[in-house]
């Protein structure tokens, strides 16, 4: 190694473990995501990350910027979490009714799944995605069910779902004389 390369290497900021502290400019598999502060061995930094433009030397200025950005993201995440918890409280107060064809014993001819629950919620003015509805299996009988709704990784809600028989048209059940 030449004298200038050695002196250049000595000027690089060292991390706590003797490696070089870098700020990732792009996501790097098995290392971190864009904006992460990472510590890597000098060879990895000098021969790959820096020449490829995947990272830059982490200065005190960069560290302050990253910390400010993380604080903003934490505040935004806390607001989202608060909003999801409020939505969960509202959903817990709600109940929806879904009509389905059933036999005399209360067994449904079909079943009620996430699609039907989302449609019933949409009719009530609540928009959710089908993958947020957590059922152990389709609902196949008449009755009251408590359905889990996944709003956020830290927030789940409960919703009461009534599955009731479809009201027959005038004259009673089809096929009745």
Swiss-Prot record:
Family: Belongs to the bacterial ribosomal protein bL9 family.
Keywords from the UniProt entry: Ribonucleoprotein, Ribosomal protein, RNA-binding, rRNA-binding
MF terms (GO), sorted A to Z: rRNA binding; structural constituent of ribosome
Signal peptide: none
Species this protein is from: Rhodopirellula baltica (strain DSM 10527 / NCIMB 13988 / SH1)
Protein name, as recorded: Large ribosomal subunit protein bL9
BP GO annotations: translation
Role: Binds to the 23S rRNA.
Pfam families on file: Ribosomal_L9_C (PF03948), Ribosomal_L9_N (PF01281)
PANTHER family in UniProt: 50S RIBOSOMAL PROTEIN L9
